[in-house]
């Protein structure tokens, strides 16, 4: 019991860590590694679309074909369809099941391989799946208790991250709307011309050249840039005789400008 309690505390302590660490292509790699160590297994966290958010391989169980899926950070579509129909934790799935994560061509190498799949829920929604597997040894009751706790912890983290992303999207859209509402028709025309001039999201431009081409004064462009910069939509830097360096910080401005075309 003491060992189970200690492991439970280790899992719940993950919630106390900042979600700022959940960055990069595989934001849940560290979490998967911690859970794999605690439960003593391989572990993978996938979202509802099958994208791999993080994984940890304590034990070698894959071949080159399956390694490619992990490197691509996307599990096979047919496998994701299968696990999406797992609504409650299914433990100790054998090597012959379609739900096993072991490669079919390695059945003879891992005849006792076992997979456990736990759905991840958050806010009443299915957010993904927590998959763990071993070369042998059943997942016993203590392991399954930890799996249930782990899937809940991951679900809370996923939901929190989704909420933060939504709040950031709303903040950015609000900034764009407020900035656009301060622009005159000529300034909106100038902003469209400026952004079309960029190579991607940043680049160098000459305000006077753009002004002459679209038939407005240079001051209109300067005022438009100043308003966008104060709203945090762009950043600019004078390059002297070479013009102005411009970088777009809020990409939503492109979609907003389409409404005025």
Swiss-Prot record:
Name assigned to this protein: Global transcriptional regulator CodY
GO biological process: negative regulation of DNA-templated transcription
Top-level taxon of origin: Bacteria
Principal location listed in the UniProt entry: cytoplasm
UniProt cross-references to Pfam families, sorted A to Z: CodY, HTH_CodY
Annotated DNA-binding residue span(s): 207-226
Keywords assigned by UniProt, alphabetized: Cytoplasm, DNA-binding, Repressor, Transcription, Transcription regulation
Location within or outside the cell: Cytoplasm
Cystine connections: none
GO cellular component terms, semicolon-separated: cytoplasm
Family: Belongs to the CodY family.
Region (GAF domain): 1-159
Claim: Repeat is one of the keywords in the record: no
Organism: Streptococcus thermophilus (strain ATCC BAA-250 / LMG 18311)
């Amino acid at each position: 019991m003491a060992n189970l309690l200690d492991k439970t505390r280790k899992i719940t302590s993950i919630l106390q860590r900042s979600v700022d660490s959940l960055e990069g292509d595989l934001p849940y790699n560290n979490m998967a590694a911690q859970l794999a160590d605690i439960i003593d297994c391989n572990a993978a966290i996938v979202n509802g679309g099958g994208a791999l958010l993080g994984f940890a391989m304590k034990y070698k169980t894959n071949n080159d074909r399956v390694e490619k899926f992990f490197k691509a950070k996307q599990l096979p579509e047919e496998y994701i369809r299968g696990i999406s129909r797992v609504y409650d934790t299914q433990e100790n799935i054998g090597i012959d099941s379609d739900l096993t994560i072991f490669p079919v061509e390695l059945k003879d190498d891992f005849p006792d391989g076992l997979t456990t799949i736990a759905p991840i829920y958050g806010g009443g929604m299915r957010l993904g799946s927590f998959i763990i597997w071993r070369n042998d040894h059943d997942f016993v009751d203590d392991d399954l208790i930890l799996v249930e706790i782990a899937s809940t912890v991951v679900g809370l983290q996923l939901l929190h991250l989704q909420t933060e992303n939504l709040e950031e999207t709303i903040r950015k859209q609000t900034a764009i709307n407020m900035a656009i509402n301060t622009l005159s028709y000529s300034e909106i025309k100038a902003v469209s011309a400026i952004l079309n001039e960029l190579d991607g999201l940043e680049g160098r431009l000459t305000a006077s050249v753009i002004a002459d081409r679209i038939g407005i004064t240079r001051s209109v462009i300067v005022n438009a840039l100043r308003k966008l910069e104060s709203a945090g939509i762009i950043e600019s830097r004078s390059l002297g005789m070479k013009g102005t360096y411009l970088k777009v910080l809020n990409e939503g401005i492109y979609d907003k400008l389409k409404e005025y075309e």
